[in-house]
A protein has these predicted regions:
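Basic, polyanion-binding surface patches
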Residues: 1-169
């Protein structure tokens, strides 16, 4: 969030880095050599919130991919509901079943020839928010979450059949 404008965007390049301490990574491709609003806001504020997209909120979340100027909010455009965070100043999105409040650990410019091609962000999760309906005995119910992944372009994917394989001892 910058100057009272809450920025949002769907990113497919997001992953777990560590469970202890809980850390995640995000990668932001530059457009014509320019940083995206989201990464610029993360680097300046040193805080951000990551949400898990699910089958119920994916259409609204997709609207946040709109190419808006920095003074316009993708969150407002998508009619998503901001909710106050506990440990960071950046609000979260009420419609997400899981959200992670994060502090910036590292930012790294990568790739490109004359200018960087992307930024890699590593954030420490300082607060988890998980809906009670999908959380039991320290585990998230993947069926209840109904997570959706962003692939590329206009493509998203639902999680298919879930199966279990015992780990060797």
């Amino acid at each position: 969030m910058k100057d009272g404008v809450l920025n949002g965007a769907p990113f497919s390049y997001f992953n777990i880095v560590s469970s202890n301490p809980p850390m995640i990574s995000l990668s932001f491709q530059r457009s014509s050599g320019k940083q995206k609003d989201t990464v610029r806001n993360i680097i300046e504020s040193k805080q951000f919130v990551v949400h898990i997209v699910d089958e119920q909120n994916v259409k609204k979340i997709n609207k946040t991919a709109a190419n808006l100027p920095p003074e316009q909010s993708e969150i407002e455009l998508a009619t998503l509901t901001p909710v106050e965070s506990v440990k960071v100043s950046v609000p979260g999105i009420k419609e997400a079943k899981i959200r992670m409040e994060c502090s910036l650990e590292h930012s790294l410019e990568l790739g490109g020839t004359d200018t960087p091609g992307c930024e890699l962000i590593i954030g420490r999760v300082v607060q988890f928010h998980i809906e009670n309906d999908i959380y039991e005995n320290g585990r998230i119910d993947p069926r209840g979450l109904a997570a959706v992944s962003r692939l590329a372009g206009n493509n998203y994917a639902k999680i298919g059949e879930i199966f279990e394989i015992a780990r060797p001892k």
